[in-house]
């Protein structure tokens, strides 16, 4: 029987959890850290605020958010892979971040009341969910009026020549890196599949608006290899 997308993604991340952080650095040539840092600068996270990191994985962005909100704030990281969360919990405990809570859960059904968080993020996770729009609507639901929803994700480069090189890299070279460094050719083949079918920047910006967000900002990184999308939930009338 053919696996659903959700089942396949779950299996992938359960299997690669122990090598995920290393492979992120290898695959992006360490650029993912700079992309996240610039995204955080644009977000302008206020101390004492409350944030949710959806599809938090091994909790790197969760930890960055914890540093921004400070000890008086609160950050919740949510992921459906218990193995990925286990790696994240080790990091959080090592840093003694009491303002962080990591939860096992599904991005399609966020277990929170409406209007709970000041910031809701998803980093390199939206492409892996069964329904992009449904998850964006869930993120919009749980963010407070005036709060921000942010997605940092791979994208589709548009520059001629660079785009072709990007496609070749993701299709052939990245899975080989997976086999070499993580013994996971099959799992890293999935990552290129999910990236290649993910919406482009303009299409995702339109989805943000359809999800109920306004003042949508788009910031491409490294010639469009990745992009930040940020939208605000309208203030209550």
Curated annotation (Swiss-Prot):
Catalytic activity line of the entry: a 2-demethylmenaquinol + S-adenosyl-L-methionine = a menaquinol + S-adenosyl-L-homocysteine + H(+)
Cysteine pairings via disulfide bonds: none
Molecular-function annotations in GO: demethylmenaquinone methyltransferase activity
Pfam families: Ubie_methyltran (PF01209)
Keywords linked to the UniProt accession: Menaquinone biosynthesis, Methyltransferase, S-adenosyl-L-methionine, Transferase
Entry EC no(s): 2.1.1.163
InterPro entries for this protein: MenG_heptapren, SAM-dependent_MTases_sf, UbiE/COQ5_MeTrFase, UbiE/COQ5_MeTrFase_CS
UniProt key word Cell membrane: no
Recorded family membership: Belongs to the class I-like SAM-binding methyltransferase superfamily. MenG/UbiE family.
Biological role stated in the UniProt entry: Methyltransferase required for the conversion of demethylmenaquinol (DMKH2) to menaquinol (MKH2).
Protein name (database record): Demethylmenaquinone methyltransferase
Originating organism: Bacillus anthracis
Gene: menG
């Amino acid at each position: 029987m053919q696996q659903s997308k959700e089942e396949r993604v779950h299996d992938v991340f359960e299997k690669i959890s122990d090598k995920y952080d290393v492979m992120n650095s290898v695959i992006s040539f360490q650029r993912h850290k700079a992309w996240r840092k610039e995204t955080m600068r644009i977000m302008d996270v206020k101390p004492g605020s409350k944030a949710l990191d959806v599809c938090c994985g091994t909790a790197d962005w969760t930890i960055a958010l914890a540093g921004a909100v400070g000890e008086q704030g609160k950050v919740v990281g949510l992921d459906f892979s218990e193995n990925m969360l286990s790696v994240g919990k080790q990091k959080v405990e090592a840093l003694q971040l009491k303002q962080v809570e990591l939860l096992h859960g599904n991005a399609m059904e966020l277990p929170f009341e409406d209007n709970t968080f000041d910031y809701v993020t998803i980093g390199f996770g939206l492409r892996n969910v069964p329904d992009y729009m449904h998850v964006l609507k869930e993120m919009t639901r749980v963010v407070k009026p005036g709060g921000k929803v942010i997605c940092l994700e791979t994208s589709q480069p548009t520059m001629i020549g660079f785009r072709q090189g990007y496609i070749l890299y993701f299709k052939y070279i990245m899975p080989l890196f997976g086999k070499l460094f993580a013994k996971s050719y099959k799992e890293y083949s999935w990552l290129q599949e999910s990236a290649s079918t993910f919406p482009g920047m303009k299409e995702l910006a339109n989805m943000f608006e359809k999800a109920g967000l306004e003042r949508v900002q788009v910031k491409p990184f490294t010639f469009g290899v990745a992009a930040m999308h940020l939208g605000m939930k309208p203030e209550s009338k």
